[in-house]
Amino acid sequence: MKTKIINLVVVTGMSGAGKTVAIQSFEDIGYFTIDNIPPSLVPKVIELLKHSEETDKIALVVDMRSRVFFDEINDILDQLESNEKLNFKILFLDATDGELVSRYKETRRSHPLAADGRVLDGIKLERELLSPLKSLSQNVVDTTKLTPRQLRKAISEQFSSKQDQSSFRIEVLSFGFKYGLPLDADLVFDVRFLPNPYYDPTLRNLTGLDKEVYDFVMTHKESEDFYKNLNHLIKPILPGYQKEGKSVLTIAVGCTGGQHRSVAFAHRLAQDLKNDWTVNETHRDKDRRKETVNRS
């Protein structure tokens, strides 16, 4: 039986340097993540996940919020280093004192080591306490000049495998405007201007996934022209979204009730995009009218 190797990244560093963004980034690229874990619990988490088939990638934030436990960190790191079943790295996030002070002023939060004092005093104490840990870190990232988006991109590029690079996915969603806009949509397209199958009694109870409705919607010249223009708009911008570190792009297509036109349009778009991208296709309101009729 092949021995399972666990990829472990311990994320640490200065408070305010971007550890929250970092751990979210690891989650986006498929890591199991825990924020603010006491060092003594790290080996126990690894032992639990060693027998799990769900993941072999773990990212854990260990920082001065767990100061009462932090004295144990060196012994724990020695254990991790000696574990042959671990591919172990430390990611240390840093920033200049001036930038950290600025970030604390912007968020109006107190520093964990200076709750009753000046932020700068807390930063200086933390830097002193973390200095040995920084010297052990294989990856030190200065976030002083980085935006959150740039930090996410840097982490994705550094810690993603080739397989993980496909973690960018597209959600193609159809919906009905009468039931509200999807809150998670990045791009919204309105196809209510197209001929409506609802007014054909033979098509009314079908959906855009049925061939009769699909053909009705997509064979009109207005539909062909709009779909062609939509493709010219969407396809060139997708690499840009991926490059900027976005993990999920939701493209929503809406009609009045979300049963006919938007379903047909979203289905065709999803099928075309699947040639080059990882795509999930969802029809939020496709059966809503049928469910309403059945309840009445």
From Swiss-Prot:
Task: Specify whether Nucleotide-binding is a keyword of the entry.
Answer: yes
S-adenosyl-L-methionine in keyword set: no
Instruction: Specify the superkingdom.
Output: Bacteria
Binding residue positions for ATP: G13, M14, S15, G16, A17, G18, K19, T20
The UniProt entry, under SUPFAM superfamilies, shows: P-loop containing nucleoside triphosphate hydrolases
| One function term, GO molecular function aspect | ATP binding
Question: One Pfam annotation, family name?
Answer: RapZ-like_N
Arranged from A to Z, the UniProt key words for this protein are: ATP-binding, GTP-binding, Nucleotide-binding
Q: Which InterPro entries match?
A: P-loop_NTPase, RapZ-like, RapZ-like_N, RapZ_C
Give the binding site residues for GTP. Answer: D63, M64, R65, S66
Which function does this protein serve? Displays ATPase and GTPase activities.
What does the similarity note say?
A: Belongs to the RapZ-like family.
Q: What's the name of the protein?
A: Nucleotide-binding protein str0831
